[in-house]
Amino acid sequence: PLVITLGTMYLFGGSALLLSGMAGATGYEGIGGFPTAFTDFANISFLGIPMPLIFFLVCCLFFWLLMHRTHMGRNVFLIGQSARVAQYSAIPVNRTLYTVYAMTGCASAIAAVLLVSYFGSARSDLGASFLMPAITAVVLGGANIYGGSGSIMGSALAALLVGFLQQGLQMAGVPNQISSALSGALLIVVVVGRSVSLHRHQILEWYSR
């Protein structure tokens, strides 16, 4: 899945770049001229809550119910632990995976529409800077990189934490390159800490020799 994900990411990214007339490579304005109602949608508030935050909360609630209160979510966790065991348990592995990929694509599309509405222009590389912070937030929120466990609310809180951290760094005048490096360093620390926690007994036995 990782190789296919990386391959399709570059495939669709390059295709979007060509379809947009190389807007992300030769210019920085992107595709504009959208209706005012569309560009104002992501910049309005409802009861004092910004519209992107409302979508974020609704998506968190939906996926929390899906992953922790339905058979679909249980099947996803079981497949993450062992796809072969899940298949022997009469769980529709392929259908479940295709459904997960489809829902991930829909969630990405919603995020893309909100980004275009917020910035008022469309670029093929508009969300490229969110890739590493998103992975960091998911791992920091408790998801196992090897599959089989995770927390929607933990990932949501970690996403807010990473977002506030990056916003604070930008307000402090820290360059984007350093901010990205800090996100990568945080991801490495979290992964190493998780690995140490999972294999602490083996590590203690090795030190006690």
Predicted regions: what is each one?
Residues 1-70, 96-99, 119-127, 203-209:
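Transmembrane helix-bundle core of multi-pass membrane transporters
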Residues 1-3, 50, 68-74, 84, ...:
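Residues that define the loop-to-transmembrane-helix transition and helix capping
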Residues 9-16, 55-64, 101-112, 140-141, ...:
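Hydrophobic core segments of alpha-helical transmembrane domains in multi-pass membrane transport
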Residues 55-59, 87, 92-116, 128, ...:
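Transmembrane alpha-helices
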Residues 61-101:
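Membrane-helix/interface signature in polytopic inner-membrane proteins
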Residues 88-95, 169-209:
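Cytosolic-side transmembrane-helix boundaries in multi-pass membrane proteins
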Residues 101, 108, 118-184:
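Transmembrane alpha-helical segments in multi-pass inner-membrane proteins
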